[in-house]
Design a protein with these regions (language model features):
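Conserved PLP-anchoring active-site segment centered on the Schiff-base-forming lysine
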Residues: 85, 103-125
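A short helix->loop->beta-strand "cap" motif at the edges of active sites that frequently abuts
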Residues: 109, 130, 188-191, 215-216
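N-terminal small-domain helix-loop-helix segment of the aminotransferase-like
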Residues: 2-92
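Generic structural signal for small/hydrophobic residues in well-ordered secondary structure
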Residues: 23-26, 73, 87, 111, ...
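Active-site phosphate-binding strand-loop segment of PLP-dependent enzymes
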Residues: 139-204
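Conserved active-site segment immediately N-terminal to the catalytic lysine
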Residues: 206-225
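Short beta->alpha connector loops at strand-helix junctions that form conserved
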Residues: 115, 131-140
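Short strand-turn motif at the edge of the Rossmann-like AdoMet-binding core
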Residues: 116, 197-199, 224
Length: 225
């Protein structure tokens, strides 16, 4: 295995601690605890009382996440009939992508990736010797996803179709009609879909998820960052 340099981190890291205003990162300034209580409506005294009785005993706990947290995560997919048992808590979105790609792809499979995309989506599969096919979004086509090109990139050996929505880094968003078409293409080839939805929910209107369409091989990845 030979992993490529992670370009965005190589570019960001040298200046990250020096910049007064960082326009190259997706993270926002963290709340103070006072701000967090005001935004959530949580009673501060009740929260602190819970903390007093919380055990600090170290144990592995629930390997895939606490039932309470998983139920909360399932709640952000109201149209997808997502249940807590469908949710896996992991160490960040990058870790989730790695688990899916490394866990699903085997020799003889191919991996179809819509690009531009987050670099790990295509470089991890390349690094383990998986044929990685790129469907390139084009500026002259307003970065619209050509469904015919996506279908043409797939065949009987396509195990996984990967995309970001909203797109990272260009911000183009696919809505219900386009996502439904992607699901139908995946069904045609019995392929999994990995949709990195890190920026889903950036506005007040409901933004559809790849898991809204009842396809059991659709995987949504998200994170707090």
């Amino acid at each position: 295995m030979k992993l490529a340099w992670f370009g965005v981190e190589e570019w960001l890291n040298p200046m990250d601690s020096l910049a007064k205003i960082n326009l190259g990162s997706s993270c926002v300034k963290a709340f103070t605890m006072d701000e967090l209580f005001r935004v959530t409506g949580q009673d501060e005294q009740a929260f602190l009382k819970d903390m007093e009785t919380m055990s600090l005993h170290y144990h592995h706990g629930d390997a895939t996440g606490s039932p309470r947290v998983k139920a909360a995560v399932a709640g952000i997919y109201p149209k997808g009939d997502v249940k807590p048992e469908h949710v896996m808590m992991v160490h960040g979105g990058t870790g989730a992508n790695d688990i899916v790609i490394m866990g699903l792809l085997e020799p003889g499979d191919n991996h179809v990736v819509v690009k531009p995309s987050y670099q790990q989506h295509y470089d991890i599969s390349k690094s383990i010797g998986i044929e990685t096919r790129i469907v390139q979004l084009k500026e002259e086509e307003d970065y619209k996803l050509d469904m015919n090109a996506l279908r043409a990139a797939c065949d009987k050996n396509t195990k996984l179709i990967t995309l970001t929505n909203p797109n990272n880094p260009i911000g183009i968003t696919l809505y219900e009609k386009e996502l439904a078409q992607i699901v139908e293409i995946a069904k045609e080839f019995d392929a999994y879909i990995l949709c990195d939805e890190m920026y889903r929910g950036m506005d007040e209107t409901y933004m559809p998820s790849i898991v809204d369409f009842g396809y059991e091989k659709a995987i949504s990845v998200s994170s707090l960052s």
